Amino acid sequence: CHARENGNDTVIPILPEALHLLGLHQNPRFHLYDTWEHTLLAIDNSPHDLAIRWALVLHDLGKGLPEIRKLNKEGQPSDPGHEAESAIMAQAILTRLGYNNSFVHLVTWLVAQHMRFAPMLLTGERTLLRWVRSEATNSGFRTQAELTQAYSLLVEVFLADMGATHARENEQLMAEGRLLGRQVVELVRTRMPVCSKDLAIGGRELLELVHQSEIKSILFYLLERVQSGNLPNEKEALLTAVHKHLKRKATISSGDNV
């Protein structure tokens, strides 16, 4: 990009961090193109959404860096952990370009998580649940709706990235990827509350059962149970769990007083 200041043209580097991707070789077992060509094709595969497009521009910036690039036993390039380094770079770039904190957080998260789907094609729902629960408690998204939206965007990033590799020639594999994407979004939307406000009951219902001072701890207990996958986020199930929890506490308390 050029800018004119005091009668002089000045070159302004927009994304110097991406220059090393041009012509950067990738493992031909998985990739048809060099890293920059792969990036451009992934962008071309994606919906016209700013967060998705930025995530794809930045998702492989860590590839080829001296501390990341390795050779596997076949002598082909490998970039383990590039997504974490790419996320660090993405956060710095988007902050430099003046994007707001929530947008920077979202895109950085998309970049950091974009490699998580591939192993899930083999391991299935158990690993999905563990991953989603971890993100519900640690990702920084404030509500179940926010987390669901983030995962919906991540699925688009994953599919666009996947479609810029040899996988694009394997319709069954692409179909499995799309199915996995639908499964994870549905899991987040229906089974993974992020905060107590996402629960099917709140303080008003609990006031009929416990003192106001206990409500916060009871809601936290229910949130953990639902996130762990052993309690459905349904009003009757939650109320039953509260009754059982209070009964156990009363039994323990009476035993301590004997």
Provide a role label for each language-model segment.
Residues 5, 21-24, 60, 106-116, ...:
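A glycine-rich phosphate-binding loop feature that marks nucleotide/adenosyl-phosphate handling sites
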Residues 9-23, 49-56, 63:
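Active-site-adjacent "gating/activation" loops or surface patches in catalytic cores
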Residues 12-15, 104-112, 215-223:
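Short, well-structured alpha-helical segments
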Residues 15-41, 67-76:
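Active-site flanking loop/helix segments enriched in acidic
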Residues 23, 35-38, 57, 150, ...:
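N-terminal alpha-helical segment
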Residues 40-172:
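Divalent metal-dependent catalytic cores for phosphoryl transfer on phosphate-bearing substrates
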Residues 90-92, 165-258:
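Charged substrate- and nucleic-acid-binding regions of tRNA-handling and nucleotidyl-transfer enzymes
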